[in-house]
Curated annotation (Swiss-Prot):
Gene Ontology terms, MF aspect: RNA binding; tRNA pseudouridine synthase activity
Role summary: Catalyzes uridine to pseudouridine isomerization (pseudouridylation) of different mitochondrial RNA substrates. Acts on position 1397 in 16S mitochondrial ribosomal RNA (16S mt-rRNA). This modification is required for the assembly of 16S mt-rRNA into a functional mitochondrial ribosome. Acts on position 39 in mitochondrial tRNA(Phe). Also catalyzes pseudouridylation of mRNAs in nucleus: acts as a regulator of pre-mRNA splicing by mediating pseudouridylation of pre-mRNAs at locations associated with alternatively spliced regions.
Active site: 105
Presequence extent in this chain: 1-11
Family recorded in the similarity comment: Belongs to the pseudouridine synthase RluA family.
EC number annotated for this UniProt entry: 5.4.99.-
Broad class of enzyme this protein falls into: isomerase
GO cellular component term, pick one: nucleus
Reaction(s) the record says it catalyses: uridine in 5S rRNA = pseudouridine in 5S rRNA; a uridine in tRNA = a pseudouridine in tRNA; a uridine in mRNA = a pseudouridine in mRNA
Residue stretches in coiled coil: none
Protein's recorded name: Pseudouridylate synthase RPUSD4, mitochondrial
Pfam families reported for this sequence: PseudoU_synth_2
Domain of life: Eukaryota
Amino acid sequence: MAAAGGGATRGARMLAERIRAERKVLEGAARETSRKNAPTIVYLRELKSQVVREDPELVLVNKPHGLPVHGGPTVERSVASLLPALAKHHFGWKAEPLKLCHRLDRDTTGALILARTTEAAERVQQALREREVHRVYWALCLGTPSPREGILDIPIMEKETSGPQKHYKMALSPRFRVSEEGAVERVRVPRSAHEAVTRYRTLGAASGASLVELHPITGVKHQLRVHLALGLNCPILGDHKYSHWGRLAPQKPPDSVLRALGLTVPQARTLSLHLHAVQLTLPSSDGSTPIVLQCPLPYTFRKTLRKLRIPPPDLESLQPPPTD
């Protein structure tokens, strides 16, 4: 009878832990729903509080997670929709609306350049087209890249996945493959594939995760996420899209990461994408010293690093733009 009682106690304890885990998942979903239903003024105040730097031509915003840059049929609020009000609240009621200079994915945080004039916006956009803007990202990944530093030069294209849950994702389109005999063969890259080049280096690793610095040379959709997940087998923490190829499912981090973060598998569904645009370097309008714009890591990102026992980097540790 004692053994049966002990088993019942363990069963009750496991049930209680499962209920607590499911409650936390529901609470996280409720917070996200509450944020989505918040009045516009809440989004406006949040965006205004994230203005990192400004001058007569440009404004640098540390974009928060979950706020899309552009609107759409299913998007109620975006950075673009807030720009007229942001300009008036920040610079006065006679201020002209700010202009978007580039994109940043909804779930990516960090440096977003806004222009105060049309001329400044066009100048930044031209520099981006001519690859004169150097971008640096920090990503918290599952696993550790091997090698720890290098260059990924693998084209990317959109493909339809196989399996019962067919959908479209960006995917690698390698120039080479290994034959059954072990020989390296060159393959023809489809015309729909885009050149994609990323420099990377590992800044620190612990608890089954690593902090990686990324220097994208090109700007293909989801380039960093695809290169890390499919090129290095190190998906970004919270990347529920590219952690699985043929199915739509939440990311399942390894046990070592879950233990360090104090999470269960159900709770890991609410993890946000840990990808941050930390620095943008662009040419100055008068041809003098380049303009370096930096945005510190958000609190949630730094909190995750502490739990994983990965030392948080400082902005001074950033490598300078490559000269080649």
